[in-house]
Amino acid sequence: MPESKSSSATPDPHTWVTILAGGSGTRFWPASTPRRPKQLLPLAGDRPLIRETVDRARELVPPERIRILTGAHLLEPFKELLEELPPEAFLVEPRVRGTGPVLAWAAREILRQDPNAVLVSLHADHAIEPLEDFLDLMREGARAASEKDFLFTVAVPPTRPETGYGYIEP
């Protein structure tokens, strides 16, 4: 795991990280396929994107508070690649319904274990730099969400219109 220079305070015992890692590899075809989707490709370095994402998550919370949200077709490749995560870290979608429903389902599952949980939701296929700034922002957001019952959203300014994704209006 890369070393972070971030101010790594003791993680809040109620902060959890969910990682959206479903997808069927259609948007990034032909490099990405249903059998080898983008999150299993080393696009931001020499390691698969899911590995990079889990390492970022481990800078925020211990492995037992990470949940990978995925489809059945990716369960085994993820378990092999992320062997440090416990079996309960992998939440397999009962049905593919999209981002909102899978996050709601994961939140319900986590809140059953920890009624005071604060969720940090990450995407498995994002390259993030600089790491220290990202980690500080995630910690600050989780703290604000916990203390003030806020929803904290991070977005980047778009470089072009993209109908395949949602958007946030200020």
Explain the meaning of each model-derived region.
Residues P2-I19, T26-P30, P34, P42-H123, ...:
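Conserved N-terminal catalytic core of the sugar/cofactor nucleotidyltransferase
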Residues P130-P170:
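Conserved core of the sugar-phosphate nucleotidyltransferase
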